[in-house]
UniProtKB/Swiss-Prot annotation:
Family, similarity comment: Belongs to the DSS1/SEM1 family.
Membrane-spanning segments: none
Native species: Arabidopsis thaliana
Domain of life: Eukaryota
Protein name stated in the entry: Protein DSS1 HOMOLOG ON CHROMOSOME V
Length: 73
């Protein structure tokens, strides 16, 4: 059998920084920074965010498991 010629393999170079061209650079506008006020962040949950309903099945089961684990120690 005759040796078959190898197909030319084309190596594609990937430019890792090619995507950087898609974003436009903006200068920092100091007037905009001065006008922006720091707004007080409202609480997203109560300070005591624990589940108020301790009578649900999960709470009872968890409490039972914790008691069993502490007894085994």
């Amino acid at each position: 059998m005759a040796a078959e010629p190898k197909a030319a393999v084309e190596v594609v170079k990937v430019d890792l920084f090619e995507d950087d061209d898609e974003f436009e650079e903006f200068e920092i506008n100091e007037d905009w920074l001065e006008k922006e006020e720091v707004k007080e962040v409202s609480l997203q949950w109560e300070d005591d965010w624990d589940d108020d309903d301790v009578s649900d099945d999960f709470s009872r089961q968890l409490k039972k498991e914790l008691e069993n684990a502490s007894e085994k120690k």
